[in-house]
């Protein structure tokens, strides 16, 4: 027989195509959850990945044999300085039935304008035009589907990043009605927003970001294909597939070498174990490897997360949570031993 068997399992997931480099370092969500809250709330935030450590906490799972006892949990540290609210955008349906921007209102940038001009060149805010745009939004409030905030990070507050150019992204407003969302967004214009205003300890969230890049890789590393034996009859190589199929076009499910990593991915239902401003509680001796010391508010997220160190990650309200409400974790110990090895 010329084949090993009648069929073989496909390699890779078609849901992750195309396996190409992400177009942006900080991707914005394609969708947001519907939040049934009486008051408006911002449905996302931005944090920077610091590194990993471990903690001890009380097990809250009643079905676990360790219920009520201390357990070892690996955590990821995300540094989350306040984000600056630049503008408020109103979205509505256009003639083609698609959501588009109906209007936007910019806030006063003040001293923060010198950082924004690094990202948006030639930005000028006309106060008269601002009042006119606000009146247009208020008059067409019934046609507004949702509001989004245009926010900017403040990397100059994080010495470890070594950059001042901010990352700009949109964050949707949820909860309340359209009028309440408009009032909520106008109050935030020109002000900063803390991570405590968005998330709470014990809450679930989704992390959207770009994975660590590995460049151009072969089928062995990219798809986990078994390496062929290295004997005299396999003279055309071992780190490759045995056959790519018929000559008239290769099937799409056949493993091929190409780009590996630096893909846009979403991790669902990551739990926040702790939100704190006490940097002495988390900074290890000698600082985090290839990062340094944490200087701002930070999150401890259960388990590992996507992305490399210093990479911005978008933190979104969970779009499909497995639990409506979880208790606040009881953290008893945080490891601050040196990570230098």
Swiss-Prot record:
State a GO cellular component annotated for this protein: cytosolic large ribosomal subunit
Q: Which UniProt keywords apply?
A: Ribonucleoprotein, Ribosomal protein, RNA-binding, rRNA-binding
- Establish whether keyword rRNA-binding is in the entry: yes
Q: Give the UniProt record's GO annotations in the biological process aspect.
A: translation
Assembly notes:
Part of the 50S ribosomal subunit. Forms a cluster with proteins L14 and L24e.
Family as reported in the entry's similarity comment: Belongs to the universal ribosomal protein uL3 family.
User: What does the function comment of this entry state?
Assistant: One of the primary rRNA binding proteins, it binds directly near the 3'-end of the 23S rRNA, where it nucleates assembly of the 50S subunit.
Q: What is this protein called?
A: Large ribosomal subunit protein uL3
Provide the gene name from the record.
Answer: rpl3
């Amino acid at each position: 027989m010329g084949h090993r068997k009648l069929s073989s399992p496909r390699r890779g997931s078609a849901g992750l195509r195309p396996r190409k480099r992400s177009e942006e370092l900080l991707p914005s969500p394609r969708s947001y959850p519907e939040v049934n809250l009486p008051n408006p709330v911002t449905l996302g935030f931005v944090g920077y990945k610091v590194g990993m450590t471990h903690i001890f906490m009380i097990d809250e799972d009643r079905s676990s044999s360790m219920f009520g006892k201390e357990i070892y949990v690996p955590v990821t540290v995300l540094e989350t300085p306040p984000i600056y609210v630049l503008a408020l955008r109103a979205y509505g349906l256009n003639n083609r039935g698609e959501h588009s921007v109906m209007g936007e209102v910019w806030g006063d940038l003040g001293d923060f304008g010198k950082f924004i001009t690094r990202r948006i060149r030639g930005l000028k805010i006309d106060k008269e035009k601002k009042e006119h745009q606000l009146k247009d939004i208020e008059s067409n409030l019934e046609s507004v589907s949702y509001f989004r905030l245009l926010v900017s990070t403040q990397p100059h507050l994080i010495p470890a990043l070594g950059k001042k150019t901010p990352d700009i992204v949109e964050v949707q407003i949820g909860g309340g009605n359209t009028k309440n969302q408009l009032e909520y967004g106008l109050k935030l214009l020109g002000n900063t927003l803390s991570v405590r205003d968005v998330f709470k300890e014990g809450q679930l969230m989704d992390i959207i970001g770009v994975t660590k890049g590995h460049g151009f890789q072969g089928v062995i590393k990219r798809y986990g294909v078994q390496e062929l034996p290295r004997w005299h009859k396999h003279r055309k190589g071992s780190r490759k597939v045995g056959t790519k199929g018929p000559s008239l076009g290769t099937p799409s499910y056949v493993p091929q070498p190409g780009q590996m990593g630096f893909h846009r991915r979403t991790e669902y239902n990551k739990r926040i174990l702790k939100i704190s401003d006490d940097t002495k509680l988390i900074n290890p001796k000698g600082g985090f490897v290839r990062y340094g010391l944490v200087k701002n508010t930070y999150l401890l997220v259960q388990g590992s997360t996507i992305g490399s160190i210093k990479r911005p990650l978008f933190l979104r309200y969970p779009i499909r949570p497995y639990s409506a409400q979880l208790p606040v974790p009881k953290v008893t110990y945080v490891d601050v031993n040196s990570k230098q090895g």
